Amino acid sequence: MNTVLELDGLRREFRRKRGVRLAAVDGVTLSVSPGEAVGLLGPNGAGKSTMIKMLTGILVPTAGRVLVCGLDPVRRRRELARRIGVVFGQRSQLWWDLPLAESFALLRTIHRVPPAEHARRLDECVELLELAPFLATPVRQLSLGQRMRGEVTAALLHSPELLVLDEPTVGLDLISKERLRVFLARANAVDGVTLLLTMHDLPDVERLCRRLVVIDHGRVLVDGSLDELRRRFGGARRLVVDLESPHAALTGLPGVLDVTVEANGLRQQLAFSAEQTSAAQLIAAVVARVAVRDLFVVEPSIEDVVRTLYTG
């Protein structure tokens, strides 16, 4: 299979008062290859959740075409359910009054997973996500972090080709977020599970996804790798230099756009253009001029990239 996900001119309209039709998703075209980890970014109302609902068969497109694992998600929704996993941050696929372990057992039957394969997958998830202490606890009594770890496990027990996660870290504490990030990164790198995530927590996206698709008003603004987006929209890189002794601003260096002097001249931040000079060239020029105690390069943050995209 060349692609796990194929969207071609995808459009979804909703009827508003007085017959006015609003396009929540407006002509989106993109493809996702097996093993990719793709972050879908956009403000509230951008069309992310509507797109997720169409590719999982919950909503029917107004126009365009969508194929997931080579299947039409509306016409072959039951077959597709055995090949993808879905996690909605605000909606559970677990049985509220049953212990977590019993929910997993029911899902094994629903997806017709062989007992040996189910046991292997479950043991792996229990170990990596540290589920053992609350497997016997009814889902309604779990904390949000515990339940979300259970949701991700439930979505992966049938070995899906594609895992779709809609705001999976919303409301989670730092420890729960980290456990989930590490587990998802492993599922992608080791098991080859294709990931499609929507998140508002941009650092989470940065750590999990090598490709970002930014949408607004139902349209794709940009689609590319994080490095590519940084180069195009992130602005200047920064070289932070800690000096052995105070020094006047290090001006006149090649490619340097701006110099910020801190700590009475002991620290200087040099904003530089990657198109005019490399970090290695700038470091060599700095070291040739002053005695350096430490230095490091700061890349434009993903927040900077997204802010530039939305504000122009």
Regions found by a protein language model. Give the residues of each.
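Catalytic Walker B motif of ABC-type/P-loop ATPase nucleotide-binding domains
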Residues: 163-167
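Conserved ABC ATPase signature
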Residues: 97, 138-145
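Conserved ABC ATPase "signature" region
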Residues: 105, 109, 116-134
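A short, flexible loop at the N-terminus of ABC-type nucleotide-binding domains that lies
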Residues: 1-4, 13-27, 77
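ABC transporter nucleotide-binding domain
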Residues: 181-273
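Helix-to-loop junction immediately C-terminal to a conserved catalytic motif
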Residues: 56
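Conserved catalytic motifs of ABC-family nucleotide-binding domains
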Residues: 159
